[in-house]
Amino acid sequence: MMQKRKLRDLEVSAIGVGCMGFSHGYGKVPETEYSINAMRKAFEVGCNFFDTAEVYGDVVFYPGHNEELVGKALSSVRKDVVLATKLHLRPDEVAARSSVYDAVKSHLVASMKRLGTDYVDLYYLHRINEEVSFEEVAAAMGRLIDKGLIRGWGLSQVDVETLAKAHAITPVSAVQNIYSMLERGCEAEVIPYCVEHNIGFVPFSPIASGFLSGKVTVDTKFEEVDDVRKFVPQLKKENITANQPILDVLADFSKLKNATNAQISLAWMLHKYPNVVPIPGSKNLERILENLGAADVTLTDNEFAQLEAALNACTVHGHRGFVETEQHTFGNNWKKKE
């Protein structure tokens, strides 16, 4: 059974599954039954933490498609899993509902219906919108916790100042920010704050859009329709070449530990911080099981120190960006399913 970690009061497997790829983001999506089977297999091998969002699916299907898929896959084990989903709040919705609380609750009720549940374990504000008070969102989340509709709440792509203000209003269970061997900005302030205040840290894109697996090369051709990797700066040919020394470091440790590059990249962050729970995403069952297997890869303190030193000696070229959810478009395509 996979080791467990805590996101404040939520006990989750050390590695979760990011479910977005079953509905969009990585090109052609799998057949429904394949996706359902993949999530169930992940549960069978010890994963109890599954991450979705109301917006996932809006390009190929419709917003909410991914939540429906996750709900269907895990309905028979609902009490044994921790479901995380996210909302994006627009100012016009707040105005229409008369309050931030009513707007947040309306999103939550819709998500619960799609997930087939009467509560959500972890409810994130997907992105901060400067036109909507995050302080009021934090207060609304507290009311929803008191009503038993959510067990905890979180923020995504948040800075430490905003996090601290929100946490003072309603204690935050988890922060979901980008973090990997190529994206380490959160190590300066956000992760230390989370450690100090008993807040879980849930990295998205922990394998850097697949780059750290070593399977993305200058010859890789991404799919034409709905493949966000086409727009990731780190996956431009010149940056793939320039970041090769990082893959060389990973390859050395993969041989040492009889593991894959992706597993080493996940084991590294698990060793580094006790509150980190990565949620690598994939639409491929083999990759999902490989990623979950990283929980069994244990680095000694000496091995970790050597790996950290080798990484620190490398220069990272390019950045990952937030191509799925750029602020100027994110949430604007929301249409209710007919």
Annotate each PLM feature:
Residues 2, 225-256, 271, 275, ...:
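Terminal-tail/helix-coil boundary detector
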Residues 21-26, 56-58, 90-96, 287-290:
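A short acidic, helix-capping loop that chelates divalent metal ions and anchors anionic groups
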Residues 10-15, 46-48, 77-81, 117-121, ...:
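Short, well-ordered coil/turn segments that N-cap beta-strands
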